[in-house]
C-alpha cells in the first residue's frame, strides 16, 4: 500500500497558522493546560525539558508515548513531539499517534550522524532547527515545513538564538541580490539545494516560517527575537523552570504579541519571580553544545 504524503503547501500552511505565537515545552497534561490557558498556539510534548535533559546526560530519546497521548487528550491546541535526528521509526510512531507536528530535534541524542529524515515522505509536517541558511535550505529540501533557530537549548541564554536568527536573515538578504550564476556558487558554498535557494530569492524570504528557540527565558527575550524578525517563539525550559510558570507563560505570550510595546513589556516583567537559572555558553564544551548536532 502506498503511503499518503502531505503536500508542501498544506504542511507549510499548517505551520503558517502558528505565526506570531508561542509554543511551549510541556511534560504532562497539567503543564499543557497551563500553556493553553496562557495563550500558547501549540505545545511540545516531551519527557524532560531541555535543561533536565542537559543535566541528566546520557542518551535522550523520544518521550514515552503515554506522555504524548496524555498531552494530546488534555488540550485543543496543536501538539508537537520530538524525535531523534534520523530516527525513522520514532518519527513513524509519532505520526501514527496523530501528533500535529514532529520536531526532528538536536535536543535529543541523534540516531544518525550522517542522514536527517526524508521529511517529504511523511504526511505529518516537521519542524527543524537551523543556525544558518545552509542548514535551513537543507532541511527545507528534505521537506521541513517549519524552522526554528537552534540557539542553545536548556541554557536560558538567548545569545545563540540571536546569533542564528541574525545570520539566517543576513544570508537571505545577500541571496536576494544575486543572479542565477552567483546562486549556484552560493549553493555550493553553503551545501544547499540550488532550487531551494532560487525559491528563497524569488520570495525574498524563507518559504517556511522560522521561529526563535533555544534560550528564551523572559518576556524581553521573546520580544527581542520578534524584533529581530522571528515568526514566533518556542520556549523550552524557560516556563516551567521559572519560579512562577503561570505568570511567565502569560507574560511571554503577551510580550511576543506586543513586542514593540516596551512599556507593556516592562509591566509584564514586574514581580514575575525568578527566571530559570542560566548557563554561560562559553563554559560549555563543544560536545555539550546541542546546537552542534545535525548538519
From Swiss-Prot:
Assembly behavior: In the presence of PdxT, forms a dodecamer of heterodimers.
Highest rank taxon of the organism: Bacteria
Gene3D superfamilies hit by this protein: Aldolase class I
Record's catalysed reaction(s): aldehydo-D-ribose 5-phosphate + D-glyceraldehyde 3-phosphate + L-glutamine = pyridoxal 5'-phosphate + L-glutamate + phosphate + 3 H2O + H(+)
GO terms (BP aspect): amino acid metabolic process; pyridoxal phosphate biosynthetic process; pyridoxine biosynthetic process
Keywords assigned by UniProt, alphabetized: Lyase, Pyridoxal phosphate, Schiff base
Similarity-based family: Belongs to the PdxS/SNZ family.
Enzyme superclass (EC): lyase
Underlying gene: pdxS
Protein name, UniProt field: Pyridoxal 5'-phosphate synthase subunit PdxS
Species of provenance: Macrococcus caseolyticus (strain JCSC5402) (Macrococcoides caseolyticum)
Record-listed D-glyceraldehyde 3-phosphate binding positions: 166
Amino acid at each position: 500500500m502506498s503511503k499518503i504524503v502531505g503536500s508542501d503547501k498544506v504542511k507549510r500552511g499548517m505551520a503558517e497558522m502558528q505565526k506570531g505565537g508561542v509554543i511551549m515545552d510541556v511534560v504532562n497534561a497539567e503543564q499543557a493546560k497551563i500553556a493553553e490557558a496562557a495563550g500558547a498556539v501549540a505545545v511540545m510534548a516531551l519527557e524532560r525539558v531541555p535543561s533536565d535533559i542537559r543535566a541528566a546526560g546520557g542518551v535522550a530519546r523520544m518521550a514515552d508515548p503515554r506522555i504524548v497521548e496524555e498531552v494530546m487528550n488534555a488540550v485543543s491546541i496543536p501538539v508537537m513531539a520530538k524525535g531523534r535526528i534520523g530516527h525513522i521509526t520514532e518519527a513513524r510512531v509519532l505520526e501514527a499517534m496523530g501528533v500535529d507536528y514532529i520536531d526532528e530535534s538536536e535536543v535529543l541524542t541523534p540516531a544518525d550522524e550522517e542522514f536527517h529524515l526524508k521529511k517529504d515522505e511523511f504526511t505529518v509536517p516537521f519542524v527543524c532547527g537551523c543556525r544558518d541558511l545552509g542548514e535551513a535550505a537543507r532541511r527545507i529540501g528534505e521537506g521541513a515545513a517549519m524552522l526554528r533557530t537552534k540557539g542553545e537549548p536548556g541554557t536560558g541564554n538567548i545569545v545563540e538564538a540571536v546569533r542564528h536568527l541574525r545570520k539566517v536573515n543576513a544570508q537571505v538578504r545577500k541571496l536576494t541580490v544575486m543572479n542565477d550564476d552567483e546562486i549556484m556558487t552560493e549553493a555550493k558554498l553553503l551545501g544547499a539545494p540550488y532550487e531551494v535557494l532560487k525559491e528563497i530569492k524569488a520570495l525574498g524570504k524563507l518559504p517556511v516560517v522560522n521561529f526563535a528557540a533555544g534560550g528564551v527565558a523572559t518576556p524581553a527575550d521573546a520580544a527581542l527575537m520578534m524584533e529581530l524578525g522571528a515568526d514566533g517563539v518556542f520556549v523550552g525550559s524557560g516556563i516551567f523552570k521559572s519560579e512562577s510558570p503561570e505568570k511567565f507563560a502569560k507574560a511571554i505570550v503577551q510580550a511576543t504579541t506586543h513586542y514593540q510595546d516596551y512599556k507593556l513589556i516592562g509591566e509584564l516583567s514586574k514581580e514575575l519571580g525568578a527566571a530559570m537559572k542560566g548557563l554561560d555558553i562559553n563554559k560549555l564544551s563543544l560536545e555539550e553544545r546541542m546546537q552542534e548536532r545535525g548538519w
